[in-house]
């Protein structure tokens, strides 16, 4: 636990990125149709979070396009988060998982038009399906709707603060 506010690092999480906090960090991000998945170990007091853009790698226009952002896609992000926590010695059954985002809205130029329909809901569904396939269930969720969210994730407590953005801001 940090002694004071100056001991806490602050990081902004971009789309497709993940952040593993082995030291006290406040991770912020802004979500529209994207989803953020956090995993926290109360025993280790360490957490990880990702900002995923699409349900699966198959959603992009050019599936042969190389992507170094493994967390850009929900399906690969869940695997990455679990592997990262496992490397820290965290067992799957001790994880607190949380899920956020999945609002309506997306720039259609970024994906095939048939994939863009309901992308927020599809991101949430993909997250829930991938987590369930790994035997995980979120302890907390704030998903869907038609407004974006600003999110703050505290890596040493697992706490998450959400601010819903006004429609005219999104």
Swiss-Prot record:
Entries under InterPro entries matching the protein: CheD-like_sf (IPR038592), Chemorcpt_Glu_NH3ase_CheD (IPR005659), Cytotoxic_necrot_fac-like_cat (IPR011324)
SUPFAM superfamilies named among the record's database cross-references: CNF1/YfiH-like putative cysteine hydrolases
GO biological process: chemotaxis
Molecular-function GO term, any one: protein-glutamine glutaminase activity
Enzyme Commission identifier(s): 3.5.1.44
Catalysis: reaction(s): L-glutaminyl-[protein] + H2O = L-glutamyl-[protein] + NH4(+)
Pfam families: CheD
KW Hydrolase (keyword) present: yes
CDD domains per the UniProt record, alphabetical: CheD
Keyword terms of this UniProt record: Chemotaxis, Hydrolase
HAMAP family the record matches: CheD (MF_01440)
Task of the protein: Probably deamidates glutamine residues to glutamate on methyl-accepting chemotaxis receptors (MCPs), playing an important role in chemotaxis.
Annotated family: Belongs to the CheD family.
Protein name: Probable chemoreceptor glutamine deamidase CheD
């Amino acid at each position: 636990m940090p002694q004071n506010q100056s001991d806490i690092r602050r990081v902004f999480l971009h789309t497709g990125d993940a952040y593993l906090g082995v030291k006290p960090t406040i991770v912020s991000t802004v979500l529209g149709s994207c989803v953020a998945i956090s995993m926290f170990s109360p025993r280790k007091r360490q957490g990880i979070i990702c900002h995923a853009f699409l349900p699966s790698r198959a959603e992009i226009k050019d599936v042969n396009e190389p992507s170094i952002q493994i967390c850009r896609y929900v399906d690969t992000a869940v695997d990455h988060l679990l592997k990262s926590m496992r490397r820290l010695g965290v067992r799957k059954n001790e994880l607190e998982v949380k899920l956020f985002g999945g609002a309506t809205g997306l720039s259609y130029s970024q994906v095939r038009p048939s994939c863009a329909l309901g992308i927020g809901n599809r991101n949430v569904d993909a997250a829930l399906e991938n987590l369930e396939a790994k035997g995980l269930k979120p302890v907390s969720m704030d998903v869907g709707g038609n407004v974006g969210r600003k999110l703050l994730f505290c890596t040493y407590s697992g706490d998450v603060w959400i601010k819903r953005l006004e429609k005219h801001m999104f």
